[in-house]
C-alpha cells in the first residue's frame, strides 16, 4: 500500500508541475527574451512591431525564457546531466563485468542499471542534446530571429525534467524495485514485472516523446517559414537539411511509439490483451517498437552527420564535396529507415520471404551512408587540413562510423544475424554508432561553436587530451565487445564463464578511459567559459579565407560589433574591451585558431 501511495503521489506531483509549466508559459509573450533588430535575422519570418522587455535576472530568466539560444543552453545542461547519469550507470555495470562472478552489485540492480543506461542515453541525452544545438544554431544558420513557435519551444523543453524523474523513479523512490525490462521493454517480461517503476518509466517516455514531437513541428515550421530573404532552398546548410529530415522521422515514429506504450500500459493495468499470449501477440510489440526504434537510430545519427558535414570542410580548406548528393542521401536515409525494422526480428520466426525483403532494404540503406563517407573523405583529400579539436573529432567520427557501419552490414545478412543476434557483437556495433559517431560529432560541435556561445576560447591541450583519451577508450571498449560477440557471449548478463574475462576487462578499462575523457571535456568547458581567453576576432576559425563564413558567424560578428544585442539589449563587448579587460588574444594562449 505504501508503494502504491508513493507512486500515486509522484504521478500527481508531476501532473501539477506540468499544468503549472503550461499555465506560466502561456502568459510569457511579454517576457520574450529577445528584441528583433532590423539588420540581424528576419527575412520570411521577420517579426516587426514587437516591443519586449529585457530578460529578467537570475534564475527567473532560465525558468521563463523563450529565447532559442537560452533554450538551447537549457537542453545542453539537461543532456549533460543525463549523460552523467547514464555514464555512472554503465561504469557500475562495467566494474561488475570486470570479474566473471557477482562481486559489486546484484543481478537485479545490474538489470535496473542496464535499463536506465539505455533509455537515458537514447531518450534523455541523445535527442535532447541534438535539440540543444538545433535550437541554438538553426535560427542563426537560416538568418531567422527565433524559432517559429518560441513558447512551444519552451514547453517542449520543460516536459523533459519531469520525464527524467519518472524514468529514474525506481532509483529515486525508496521501497520500489527498479524497472528491469531493458530499453526495448519486450513483452511478456514488461507485462509481468509488477513494480510501479515500470509504469512510471513508460509515462516518462510519453513525456519525452511529446517533447520531441513538439520540437520536430517547431523545426519544420522554422526551416520552412523563418528563413531569411537570402536563404533559399539551394542555400540551406547541410545541418538544417539533416534537422529537417530528422524532424520528419520524429513525426512519423514517435506518435506510433506513444500508441504502443498506451497499449502496454493498458495491458499492465486494465486487463487488455494487446501483447499477451491469451488474446494478442508478444511479437506485435516488437513490430511496433522497432518500427519506431530503427528510425530513432537515424533520428539520433542524421543531425550529427550534418554537423560533421558542416564542420569538416571548414578545416579542410575546401567546400563539402558533392553537397547535393549529401542532401539526397540524407533524404534517402529518411525514407528507407521505415522499411528495415524487421532486421531486428530475424530470429523470431517471421516468414522467410519477409525476412529476405527486409535484408535487401537493410543492405540498401547502407548505400546513402556510404555516399556520405565517400564525400567526407574526398573533401579531406588533398585539402589543407587543420587538426583543431573540432576537426579531430570529425575525423574520429568518420573512423568510428565506418567500423559501426560495416559491422552493421554483416548483421543485415540473415545467416550471420542468426548467429550473432543478442550477442555482444550487436552491442559493440551499436555503440560504435551511438558514442563513437554521435558522441564524437557532438563534441566537435561543442568545440566549434564554443567561441560563438561564450566569446571565449577553450584550452587546446585539454581538448586534444579529451580526443585521444576518448578515441582510445571507445575503440578499446567496443572492439572488445565485437570480440566477445564473435566468441558467443550473450548480452544482458551480469555474470559469465571465465573464458570471456580478458575481453571484459579490456572493455572495462576502455569504459573508464571514456569516463576520464568526459571529465576532461567538462572541466575544459566549465573553466574556459568562466575564465578562458576572449576571442580576438569575430572569425576565430579564419573561415573567410576559404569562403566558408556562414550565417551563424555573421550573426556573431553583428552581435560583437553592435551596441544592442539581439537577445535583450545588453551592451556588446567590443574587441578593444576584450583585450583591455585582462583577456589575452587566442593566438598568444594555449588555444586554437
From Swiss-Prot:
Binding residue positions for heme a3: 429
Cross-link 1'-histidyl-3'-tyrosine (His-Tyr) placement: 294-298
A cellular component term, taken from the record's GO annotations: plasma membrane
UniProt pathway annotation: Energy metabolism; oxidative phosphorylation
Primary gene name: coxA2
GO MF entries: cytochrome-c oxidase activity; heme binding; metal ion binding
Keywords recorded for this protein, A-Z: Cell membrane, Copper, Electron transport, Heme, Iron, Membrane, Metal-binding, Respiratory chain, Translocase, Transmembrane, Transmembrane helix, Transport
Species per Swiss-Prot/TrEMBL record: Halobacterium salinarum (strain ATCC 700922 / JCM 11081 / NRC-1)
InterPro entries per record: Cyt_c_oxase-like_su1_dom, Cyt_c_oxase-like_su1_sf, Cyt_C_Oxase_1, Cyt_c_Oxase_su1_BS, Cyt_c_oxidase_su1_bac
Function according to Swiss-Prot or TrEMBL: Cytochrome c oxidase is the component of the respiratory chain that catalyzes the reduction of oxygen to water. Subunits 1-3 form the functional core of the enzyme complex. CO I is the catalytic subunit of the enzyme. Electrons originating in cytochrome c are transferred via the copper A center of subunit 2 and heme A of subunit 1 to the bimetallic center formed by heme A3 and copper B.
Record: residues binding Cu cation: 294, 298, 343-344
GO biological process: aerobic respiration; electron transport coupled proton transport; oxidative phosphorylation; respiratory electron transport chain
EC class: translocase
Disulfide-bonded cysteines: none
Family the UniProt entry places it in: Belongs to the heme-copper respiratory oxidase family.
Stretches for region Disordered: 562-593
Binding site for Fe(II)-heme a: 117, 431
Keyword Nucleotide-binding in record: no
Bilayer topology: Multi-pass membrane protein
TM spans (from-to): 5-25, 71-91, 122-142, 154-174, 204-224, 246-266, 288-308, 320-340, 358-378, 401-421, 425-445, 467-487, 506-526
Name recorded for this polypeptide: Cytochrome c oxidase polypeptide 1
Compartments, record wording: Cell membrane
Reaction(s) this enzyme catalyzes, per UniProt: 4 Fe(II)-[cytochrome c] + O2 + 8 H(+)(in) = 4 Fe(III)-[cytochrome c] + 2 H2O + 4 H(+)(out)
Enzyme Commission numbers on file: 7.1.1.9
Amino acid at each position: 500500500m505504501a508503494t502504491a501511495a508513493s507512486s500515486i503521489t509522484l504521478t500527481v506531483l508531476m501532473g501539477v508541475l506540468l499544468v503549472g509549466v503550461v499555465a506560466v508559459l502561456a502568459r510569457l509573450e511579454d517576457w520574450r527574451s529577445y528584441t528583433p533588430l532590423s539588420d540581424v535575422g528576419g527575412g520570411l519570418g521577420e517579426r516587426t512591431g514587437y516591443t519586449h522587455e529585457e530578460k529578467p535576472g537570475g534564475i527567473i530568466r532560465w525558468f521563463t525564457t523563450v529565447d532559442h539560444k537560452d533554450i538551447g543552453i537549457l537542453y545542453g545542461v539537461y543532456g549533460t546531466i543525463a549523460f552523467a547519469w547514464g555514464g555512472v550507470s554503465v561504469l557500475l555495470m562495467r566494474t561488475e563485468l570486470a570479474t566473471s562472478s557477482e562481486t559489486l552489485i546484484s543481478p537485479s540492480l545490474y538489470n535496473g542499471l542496464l535499463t536506465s543506461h539505455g533509455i537515458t542515453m537514447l531518450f534523455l541525452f541523445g535527442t535532447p542534446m541534438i535539440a540543444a544545438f538545433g535550437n541554438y544554431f538553426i535560427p542563426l544558420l537560416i538568418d531567422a530571429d527565433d524559432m517559429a513557435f518560441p513558447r512551444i519551444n519552451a514547453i517542449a523543453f520543460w516536459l523533459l525534467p519531469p520525464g527524467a524523474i519518472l524514468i529514474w523513479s525506481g532509483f529515486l523512490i525508496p521501497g520500489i524495485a527498479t524497472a528491469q525490462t531493458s530499453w526495448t521493454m519486450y513483452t511478456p517480461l514488461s507485462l509481468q514485472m509488477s513494480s510501479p517503476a515500470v509504469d512510471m518509466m513508460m509515462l516518462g517516455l510519453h513525456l519525452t516523446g511529446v517533447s520531441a514531437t513538439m520540437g520536430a513541428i517547431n523545426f519544420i515550421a522554422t526551416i520552412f517559414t523563418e528563413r531569411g530573404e537570402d536563404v533559399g532552398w539551394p542555400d540551406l546548410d547541410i545541418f538544417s537539411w539533416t534537422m529537417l529530415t530528422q524532424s520528419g522521422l520524429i513525426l512519423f515514429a514517435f506518435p506510433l511509439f506513444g500508441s504502443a506504450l498506451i497499449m502496454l500500459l493498458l495491458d499492465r493495468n486494465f486487463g487488455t490483451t494487446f501483447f499477451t499470449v491469451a488474446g494478442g501477440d508478444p511479437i506485435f510489440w516488437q513490430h511496433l517498437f522497432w518500427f519506431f526504434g530503427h528510425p530513432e537510430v537515424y533520428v539520433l545519427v542524421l543531425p550529427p552527420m550534418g554537423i560533421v558535414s558542416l564542420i569538416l570542410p571548414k578545416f579542410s580548406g575546401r567546400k563539402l564535396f558533392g553537397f547535393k548528393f549529401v542532401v539526397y542521401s540524407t533524404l534517402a536515409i529518411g525514407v528507407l529507415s521505415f522499411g528495415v525494422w524487421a532486421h531486428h526480428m530475424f530470429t523470431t520466426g517471421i516468414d522467410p520471404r519477409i525476412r529476405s525483403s527486409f535484408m535487401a532494404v537493410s543492405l540498401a540503406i547502407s548505400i546513402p551512408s556510404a555516399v556520405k563517407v565517400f564525400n567526407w573523405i574526398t573533401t579531406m583529400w588533398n585539402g589543407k587540413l587543420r587538426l583543431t579539436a573540432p576537426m579531430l573529432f570529425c575525423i574520429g567520427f568518420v573512423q568510428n562510423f565506418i567500423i559501426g557501419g560495416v559491422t552493421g552490414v554483416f548483421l543485415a545478412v540473415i545467416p550471420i544475424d542468426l548467429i550473432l543476434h543478442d550477442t555482444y557483437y550487436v552491442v559493440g556495433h551499436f555503440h560504435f554508432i551511438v558514442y563513437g559517431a554521435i558522441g564524437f560529432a557532438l563534441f566537435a560541435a561543442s568545440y566549434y561553436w564554443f567561441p560563438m556561445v561564450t566569446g571565449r576560447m577553450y584550452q587546446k591541450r585539454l581538448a586534444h587530451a579529451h580526443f585521444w583519451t576518448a578515441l582510445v577508450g571507445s575503440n578499446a571498449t567496443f572492439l572488445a565487445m565485437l570480440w566477445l560477440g564473435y566468441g558467443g557471449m550473450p548480452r544482458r548478463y551480469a555474470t559469465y564463464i571465465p573464458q570471456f574475462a580478458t575481453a571484459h576487462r579490456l572493455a572495462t578499462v576502455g569504459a573508464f578511459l571514456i569516463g576520464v575523457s568526459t571529465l576532461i571535456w567538462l572541466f575544459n568547458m566549465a573553466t574556459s567559459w568562466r575564465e578562458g581567453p576572449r576571442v580576438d576576432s569575430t572569425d576565430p576559425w579564419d573561415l573567410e579565407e576559404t569562403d566558408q563564413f556562414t550565417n551563424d558567424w555573421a550573426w556573431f560578428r553583428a552581435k560583437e560589433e553592435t551596441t544592442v544585442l539581439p537577445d535583450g539589449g545588453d551592451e556588446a563587448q567590443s574587441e578593444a574591451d576584450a583585450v583591455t579587460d585582462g583577456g589575452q588574444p587566442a593566438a598568444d594562449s594555449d588555444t586554437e585558431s
